[in-house]
Amino acid sequence: MNDGFGDKRKKKMKNEKIYLYLDDTRTPKEGNWEVVRGYDEFVAHIRLNGLENYEVISLDHDLGESAMEEYYNNAKPNFEINYKNIVEKTGMDCARWLVAESMTKEIPLPQIYVHSANPIGSANIIGYINNYLKNQRLPTGCVSVKIPHTITVKQFYD
């Protein structure tokens, strides 16, 4: 199957649990993380392997230039995110998809981490996941983490 995702979507053996890292620019330095760069690749990876085969999923919020611009131009100074200004799907869209997938397939979510540098985006994802877990009468455990990673810096100027 040649759909542009290359080797990143290799199906794991049934007994191997997957650690998935969603980030458009950074790559974890340590661990056995599989890296996906955007929403479509994220969804395809989970559909291929099955949600039940994931141990941990770590989400970034800002997955493209318009998301970063919204963070620097609006979220950072005004403490809010206007999702209408963001063209690309974000980590929040991935969180919504995960919850829908969990509900539809009746599969519990794996441990969800958020490693985004955007504190408002992180809080939105964490709140969404933990509210879902609480509604399902499950322990809340979605947390913000720092995972050592390669550094790719993007600067945006007015």
Locations of regions flagged by a protein language model:
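Catalytic phosphate/metal-binding cores of nucleic-acid and nucleotide-processing enzymes, i.e., regions
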Residues: N2-D158
